[in-house]
């Protein structure tokens, strides 16, 4: 076991680099948790059936999204290794492959929800009204699974390049300045379904902003590798 002298410049720089990469992700998760509590308050205003349906459908949604999050994590490691090795073509190909997998997953998931969404809800409740509301949520959100997955793919590539600050900023901005205000506004016009559409709209805006940032190649202070994707 090698004991590091924390007074050395090497360990100090490593610690700073670790904090620079890891701290934004921690802040992001805290902000997201608080934002979801605020969103839950809007959902709760539509009654217990809507709240129950949102909770049950949200569990299904979370299970589905885990596949994309796993893909994003794998891509981050892949990009980090290949950027470090100077294999920039592999980074480009890896992102393209991840987007293809995301597309196939999104289409398969939406198809499954369209035909079996109500049966998925039966795993959590037998209340017909709750099942109906839950399937409504899943159908609307299912239309945005590819968008959500694409956002996570690009975020994975950015994190692999060492840029965790930008994904954090976009995530917090889209949640607190876009999703929650839109949820209030849309729900006042279209009722509870407006909340689901607000979530989808915030994902689209987040993907657009992230893709532009990714495309112009400002992902990190290292190599401008992303513009070729």
What are these regions (language model features)?
Residues 117, 123, 132, 175-208:
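Membrane-interface helix-loop junctions in multi-pass transport and translocation proteins
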Residues 1-10, 219, 223-229:
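Single conserved hydrophobic/aromatic residue that forms the stacking wall/gate
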Residues 30-59, 63, 81, 119-128, ...:
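Helix-terminus/linker motif at the lipid-water interface of multi-pass membrane proteins
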Residues 54-117, 148-170:
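Small-residue-rich hydrophobic transmembrane alpha-helices
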Residues 68, 128-151:
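Alpha-helical transmembrane segments of multi-pass membrane proteins
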Residues 11-38, 63, 67, 71, ...:
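Hydrophobic faces of transmembrane alpha-helices in multi-pass small-molecule transporters and flippases
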Residues 203-224:
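Multi-pass alpha-helical transporter architecture, strongest
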Residues 108-131, 135:
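Short membrane-interface helical motifs at transmembrane helix boundaries
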């Amino acid at each position: 076991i090698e004991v590091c002298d924390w007074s050395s410049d090497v360990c100090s720089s490593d610690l700073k680099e670790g904090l620079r990469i890891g701290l934004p992700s921690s802040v992001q998760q805290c902000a997201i948790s608080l934002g979801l509590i605020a969103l839950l308050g809007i959902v709760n205003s539509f009654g217990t059936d809507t709240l129950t349906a949102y909770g049950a459908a949200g569990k299904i949604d979370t299970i589905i999204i885990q596949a994309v999050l796993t893909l994003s994590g794998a891509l981050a490691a892949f990009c980090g290794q290949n950027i470090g090795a100077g294999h920039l073509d592999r980074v480009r190909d890896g992102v393209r492959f991840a987007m293809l997998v995301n597309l196939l997953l999104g289409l398969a998931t939406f198809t499954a929800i369209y035909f079996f969404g109500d049966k998925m809800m039966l795993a959590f409740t037998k209340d017909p009204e709750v099942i109906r509301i839950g399937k409504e949520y899943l159908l609307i959100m299912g239309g945005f699974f590819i968008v959500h997955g694409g956002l996570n793919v690009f975020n994975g590539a950015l994190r692999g390049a060492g840029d965790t600050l930008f994904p954090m900023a976009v995530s917090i901005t889209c949640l607190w300045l876009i999703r929650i205000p839109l949820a209030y506004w849309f729900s006042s016009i279209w009722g509870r379904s407006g909340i689901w559409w607000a979530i989808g709209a915030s994902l689209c805006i987040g993907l657009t902003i992230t893709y532009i940032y990714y495309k112009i190649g400002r992902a990190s202070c290292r190599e401008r590798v992303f513009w070729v994707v």
